[in-house]
Design a protein with these regions (language model features):
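N-terminal, positively charged, Ser/Thr/Ala/Gly-biased leader segments
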Residues: 1-17
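Conserved phosphate-donor
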Residues: 43-61, 188-200
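Short beta-strand-to-turn element immediately C-terminal to the catalytic PLP-Schiff-base lysine
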Residues: 23-26, 50-51, 170-173
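Generic N-terminal amphipathic, Lys/Arg-enriched alpha-helix
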Residues: 16-24
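Short beta-strand micro-motifs enriched in acidic
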Residues: 11, 51-53, 115-119
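Acidic, low-complexity central loop/insert segments
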Residues: 37, 65-195
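Hydrophobic N-terminal alpha-helices or hydrophobic patches in metabolic proteins across all domains
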Residues: 6, 28-43, 47-56, 90, ...
Length: 200
């Protein structure tokens, strides 16, 4: 069965300049394995799958997949999907009593409001992200972090695992100069992501 999808660059007005995203406009009937296969096929950081809203509160339902797994929330896929659905005329924002126009995205992270301002080329969409929480405080010599932090001059604060719809590690470096000079070990970051069920 043919499926309509759009590939776009979020946060950019020209191709190749923003955050790449694929949006499958009608994902009804696709199972988890099919969605994961499509996300792998696109080879983009994220692919979203749009489904009918499950309640009157929501404008639509969304599932977000990286090439490796489903993720509960991601900012640029949420904003990009809203733009695509608005451009296609598949959703319309609801005007609130205070004049704001909102879409409500329903997904693993819950129902999230997206504020829509303007129209066409001047349209903006802003998402209220899930509140981030500290999941774990680690020691700098934690074996899981050793490869990802190797050679980096750390600051005073310990590394922390955050969860804001997606899990990721944060580590304070000693200075802005250290940050600018850092050369990430991507293989070590991938290993960290796999070992801790995080984005790295």
């Amino acid at each position: 069965m043919a499926r309509r999808f759009v590939q776009l660059d979020v946060f950019a007005s020209v191709p190749g300049a923003g955050n790449p995203l694929a949006v499958v406009l009608d994902a009804e009937g696709l199972d988890d394995a099919a969605m994961q296969a499509i996300a792998r096929w696109t080879r983009l950081p994220e692919t979203t799958f749009v489904l009918p809203a499950a309640s009157d509160e929501a404008s639509y339902r969304i599932r977000i997949f990286s090439p490796r797994r489903e993720v509960p929330f991601a900012g640029h896929p949420s904003v990009g999907t809203a733009h695509v659905l608005l451009d296609a005329g598949l959703v319309a924002p609801r005007r609130q009593a205070d004049g704001r126009r909102l879409l409500v995205q329903d997904g693993i992270a819950g129902k999230l409001p997206l504020e829509v301002a303007g129209e066409g080329a001047t349209r903006t969409v802003a998402v209220r992200t899930p509140r981030a929480r500290v999941q774990e405080i680690a020691q700098p010599d934690d074996a899981r972090l050793r490869g990802a932090l190797a050679g980096l001059p750390l600051g005073q604060l310990p590394p922390v695992l955050m969860d804001g719809g997606r899990r990721w590690w944060l580590a304070e470096l000693a200075s802005e100069t250290a940050l600018r000079a850092a050369t990430p070990d991507w293989d070590a970051i991938v290993a960290l992501a796999e070992a801790t069920d995080s984005m790295g």
